[in-house]
C-alpha cells in the first residue's frame, strides 16, 4: 500500500511538472507573439531563444487556451460527488477552539469533526484517505483565539495555509437560534488573478452543489488579499424584496502558503506559492486579484 501511494504520488508530481513546463513555454511564446504583432522590442530574457520560439509559433493554432488536463486536475470529481470534509484541531485544544471547530462543522454540509487526542498528522491523513475523505481541515489557536486554518486536499494535495483574524463565533452572540444545514449557494468575489482562481477553487470545492431552492448563502470576498467569510440566510418578504440575516460565524482569512503535497508531507512537498512579508514591496502588492 505504501509503495502504491509513493508511485501514484511520483506520477502525479511528474505530470504536474510537465504541465507547468508546458504552461511556462506557452507564456513565453505569447509574450514574443505580442511583441512582434505590436512592433515592440523583444523582452531581454527572451532574446536568446527568440528564433526557436518564433519557429514553434508557426505550428500553434487558436482554440487551445484555457484547456486543463482532467487527468492531472486535483478537483476533477468536483460537482460529481459531494466532498467529504473532516475537521480537527491542534493538540490539546482549549474550549473555545473546540467551539469554533463545532461551528465549522455546521458550515460545511456533511462534514465530520474528530477529536485530535494524541494522534499524529501522518496517522490522521492515512485514516482520512482510507475512509474516502476529500479534504482535511485543521484549526490552530493562540491562547484560546483561533489564529490558523489549514486546508489539505486528499489524496495528493494541494495544502493551503491561512491566518485567521477577526473571528466572531456564534457562541459569542446570544439568542441566535439554530443554523441551517442546507447546501449553500456560494459567492466568490475578487479572485481575478491566477493565484486567486487557485485559492477560489480550494475554498469553493469544500462545498457540494446546492439545490435551487436553498436559502443559505456563503460569501468569500477578497479585498487586499484578505478573504472575508460571511454566512447568511435570506427570505423573500415579497416578490421584489429579500431580507438577509447573518447567522455566523464570521472571520477573515489571509493566505500565506500553498504546498503541492498533503499535510504530512510538510518537509518534502514543493512549495507552490509563499507570501514574503519582509520584502520592500510587500505592503503594495496584491496577489489574489489582478488589479
Swiss-Prot record:
The keyword rRNA processing applies. Residues 83-264 form the Brix domain. Keywords: Nucleus, Ribonucleoprotein, Ribosome biogenesis, rRNA processing. One of its GO terms (biological process) is ribosomal small subunit biogenesis. InterPro entries: Brix, IMP4/RPF1. One of its GO terms (cellular component) is Mpp10 complex. The keyword Nucleus applies. Part of the small subunit (SSU) processome, composed of more than 70 proteins and the RNA chaperone small nucleolar RNA (snoRNA) U3. Component of a heterotrimeric complex containing IMP3, IMP4 and MPHOSPH10. Interacts with MPHOSPH10. Component of the 60-80S U3 small nucleolar ribonucleoprotein (U3 snoRNP). Required for the early cleavages during pre-18S ribosomal RNA processing. Part of the small subunit (SSU) processome, first precursor of the small eukaryotic ribosomal subunit. During the assembly of the SSU processome in the nucleolus, many ribosome biogenesis factors, an RNA chaperone and ribosomal proteins associate with the nascent pre-rRNA and work in concert to generate RNA folding, modifications, rearrangements and cleavage as well as targeted degradation of pre-ribosomal RNA by the RNA exosome. This is U3 small nucleolar ribonucleoprotein protein IMP4. The lineage of its organism: Eukaryota, Metazoa, Chordata, Craniata, Vertebrata.
Amino acid at each position: 500500500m505504501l509503495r502504491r501511494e509513493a508511485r501514484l504520488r511520483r506520477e502525479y508530481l511528474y505530470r504536474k511538472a510537465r504541465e507547468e513546463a508546458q504552461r511556462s513555454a506557452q507564456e513565453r511564446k505569447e509574450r514574443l507573439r505580442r511583441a512582434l504583432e505590436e512592433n515592440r522590442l523583444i523582452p531581454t530574457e527572451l532574446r536568446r531563444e527568440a528564433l526557436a520560439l518564433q519557429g514553434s509559433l508557426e505550428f500553434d493554432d487558436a482554440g487551445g487556451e484555457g484547456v486543463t488536463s482532467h487527468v492531472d486536475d486535483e478537483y476533477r470529481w468536483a460537482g460529481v460527488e459531494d466532498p467529504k470534509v473532516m475537521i480537527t484541531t491542534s493538540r490539546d485544544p482549549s474550549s473555545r477552539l473546540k467551539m469554533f471547530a463545532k461551528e465549522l462543522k455546521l458550515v460545511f454540509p456533511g462534514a465530520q469533526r474528530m477529536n485530535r487526542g494524541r494522534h499524529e498528522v501522518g496517522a490522521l491523513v492515512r485514516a482520512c484517505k482510507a475512509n474516502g475523505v476529500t479534504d482535511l481541515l485543521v484549526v490552530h489557536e493562540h491562547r484560546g483565539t483561533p489564529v490558523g486554518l489549514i486546508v489539505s486536499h486528499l489524496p495528493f494535495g494541494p495544502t493551503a495555509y491561512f491566518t485567521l483574524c477577526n473571528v466572531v463565533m456564534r457562541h459569542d452572540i446570544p439568542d441566535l437560534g439554530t443554523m441551517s444545514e442546507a447546501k449553500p449557494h456560494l459567492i466568490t468575489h475578487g479572485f481575478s488573478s491566477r493565484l486567486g482562481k487557485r485559492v477560489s477553487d480550494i475554498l469553493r470545492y469544500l462545498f457540494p452543489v446546492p439545490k435551487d431552492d436553498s436559502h443559505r448563502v456563503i460569501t468569500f470576498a477578497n479585498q487586499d488579499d484578505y478573504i472575508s467569510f460571511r454566512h447568511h440566510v435570506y427570505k423573500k418578504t415579497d416578490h421584489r424584496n429579500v431580507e438577509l440575516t447573518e447567522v455566523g460565524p464570521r472571520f477573515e482569512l489571509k493566505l500565506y502558503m500553498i504546498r503541492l503535497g498533503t499535510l504530512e508531507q510538510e518537509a518534502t512537498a514543493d512549495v507552490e506559492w509563499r507570501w514574503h512579508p519582509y520584502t520592500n514591496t510587500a505592503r503594495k502588492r496584491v496577489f489574489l486579484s489582478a488589479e
